[in-house]
Each structure stands twice: as C-alpha cells, then as structure tokens.
C-alpha cells in the first residue's frame, strides 16, 4: 500500500497568530519530489529532490519568468491579502538572484554541491529532473489528481495525457498554496485511504526491468565510444543482455515478495 502520485496540500498553524501556513508535496510516479512550504514570515520556499530549500521565486526564474513584474503578475489575483503579500516577500528574500542564469546556477549549487556550476549544466539538470519523460513520470493517476486539485487555476490548459510537469502546473500549484494560506481553500488529507493505492507485482517487476534496460543502455553507450570503426561494429558486439537478466534475478532473489 503506497501513496498515490499527485499533489498534496497540508497546513500547520503559526503558534503566535494561529493563522494557517500551507505546504505542498508534488509526488510523481517516478522521479524527484518537489516540496513547498510557507514560513511564518510569508516567504514561500521550494525543495527539489529533498535538497536545501530555496525561495520559490528562484524556481520561477529558472522557468522563464525572469523579472519581478512577470512573477507578480502571475499571482496578482490570488495574492491579494494586504497583510500578507507572499510573492512580494519571497522576491525580497531572494534579492540576490535577478536573472534566469543566476537562478539556474543557484539551484545547481544546491542540487550538486561541490561541482563547478554553470547555467548550461544547470538548465540540463532541471530539465532532466522534471521535464524529461525518461526520468520523470507523473503517471495517469498523478496527472488526474494534479488536474483535479488545481481545477480552475490554470491560465493555459494542459493535455490530460501529458505525464511530465509543465511550468503552468507549478504556477497553478503555487496559486492554490496562496489560497490556502489566505484561508480561501482547504488542504487535503495526505494520509486518507483514498490517496493510497496497492502496488501490484507486475508494476514492481516492470520497474525492475526498466532498471535493467537503463543499465544495458549505459553499457551500450560505453561500448560505442570504444568501438572506433562503425563499418565493422555489429549489434552483437555492442549489446549485452546481462544487466537485464541480473536485474530480474535480483528482483526474484531479493524482493520482499
């Protein structure tokens, strides 16, 4: 019994004022998690792949919303509480990052600490984590739950069969988060049985076979760099099925089933 993919909103209450502080988890069927939280100082943070948190305005800049005006315009109809301006406060917290390249480098530092950052590598990393169907998959259930939770918030409709994230998904999620912070919407119960599902044996085997194919692909790519003569190289010299066989044996020999 595992948690279904999708977006889940929850809320804590500030101990001083008692007002709600919303958070959200975007859980894919396969891939990196994206988590959002609101501080008691009205700053909204995001954590990618469970790494260090960053003001969400940095994430929005990596998606192409580069100026403060563009970011504020996305939320002007929901971030309208005069006492709590979440996006303005978040931008002020993130005053050191003002361009897309700076935002990309900031994320790269947090996701790959110790490696020399540059904007090109950072862009490739962000795209591979959340916008590449080979590494990220919401699943049909995840896409359905995402759409049902964010109904009426999107300024651009997304094809229901799309199983990777879009920047519209992220903006709409943040719009809902602000509504919960303003007590205009309610959070959902992440632990409700309706948000759980049974992971069948076939699905477990499928995931393990996928791991085997990825290992086999890596071996093939390595051999292709070594084999210098494409005229004499044959498929049999490049392809080795042992990683797939080993992955399946590993499942049947070591799985809790």
List each model region and its residues.
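N-terminal non-catalytic structural scaffold regions of very large proteins
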Residues: 1-256
């Amino acid at each position: 019994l595992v948690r279904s993919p999708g977006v889940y909103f929850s809320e804590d209450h500030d101990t001083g004022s008692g007002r709600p502080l919303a958070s959200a988890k975007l859980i894919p069927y396969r891939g990196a998690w994206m988590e959002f939280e609101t501080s008691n100082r009205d700053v909204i943070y995001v954590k990618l792949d469970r790494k260090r948190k960053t003001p969400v305005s940095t994430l929005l800049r990596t998606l192409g919303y580069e100026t403060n005006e563009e970011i504020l315009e996305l939320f002007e109809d929901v971030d309208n509480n005069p006492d709590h301006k979440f996006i303005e406060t978040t931008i002020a917290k993130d005053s050191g990052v003002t361009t897309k390249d700076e935002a990309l480098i900031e994320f790269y530092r947090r996701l790959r600490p110790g490696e020399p950052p540059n904007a090109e590598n950072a862009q490739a990393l962000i795209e591979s984590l959340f916008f590449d169907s080979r590494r990220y998959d919401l699943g049909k259930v995840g896409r359905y739950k995402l759409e049902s939770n964010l109904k009426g918030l999107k300024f651009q409709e997304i094809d229901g069969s799309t199983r990777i994230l879009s920047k519209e998904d992220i903006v709409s999620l943040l719009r809902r988060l602000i509504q919960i912070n303003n007590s205009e919407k309610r959070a959902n119960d992440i632990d409700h049985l309706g948000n759980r599902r049974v992971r069948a044996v076939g699905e477990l085997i499928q995931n393990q076979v996928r791991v085997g194919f990825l290992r086999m692909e890596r071996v093939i790519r390595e051999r292709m760099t070594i084999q210098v003569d494409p005229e004499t190289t044959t498929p049999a010299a490049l392809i080795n099925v042992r990683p797939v066989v080993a992955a399946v044996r590993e499942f049947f020999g070591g799985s809790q089933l």
